[in-house]
């Protein structure tokens, strides 16, 4: 079996207090395939860049790329990372997030049969606090079989637990400031379906996600964007109905 080559993209800005555990979670992986770690920094003014440079020096087995410059927001930075990525699969692991345990990547790729037939690999997500302590499992659970229509019921898979084949990945649509990841995941899955690729459910927690991200801080604006995205892909009336059902979930 060919070993998939993975690109992990991490976006940072003044993240010295939480970035360390993100970098450590990548460095401790038992996975023996080639991994590149692309870190896109928004011109941090704290010690974020020092942390990354030390990480790069101490872990030559990981191909670390650092870009630090002003950006136009999170999704602009993520697009910069996508342009640099060379891996067969791409994942996003932003500052404060971490791979769930040291076996995460090995479990994903060494146990995936025929990875060349896979469009997306996905799993569940734990929520952690600023100190990395477990708070709860994410409210929405990954469906048994994920398709592009699954997000009619909400974003059932956290972006950080969504590993996408790079050739399927479009740029993030910058018209969406808070929920472009929803639109992006749908487009990735639609493209995979058109290519006859399948999506693989790992049936395990892949990521510990830092509570209180940009979407939560801009909750109302994010909900409006998500409604627009869902109406675009699934139709206005089904989207209204599904949002009515959300009230009782």
Where in this protein do the model-derived segments appear?
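A sequence-level detector of short, solvent-exposed, charge-rich linear segments
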Residues: 100, 105, 187, 221, ...
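Catalytic core of nucleotide-sugar-dependent glycosyltransferases
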Residues: 192, 204-205, 216-240
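Membrane-interface aromatic/basic loop that binds lipid-linked glycans or pyrophosphate carriers
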Residues: 1-3, 32, 44, 229-249
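Nucleotide-sugar donor-binding/catalytic module of glycosyltransferases
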Residues: 1-218
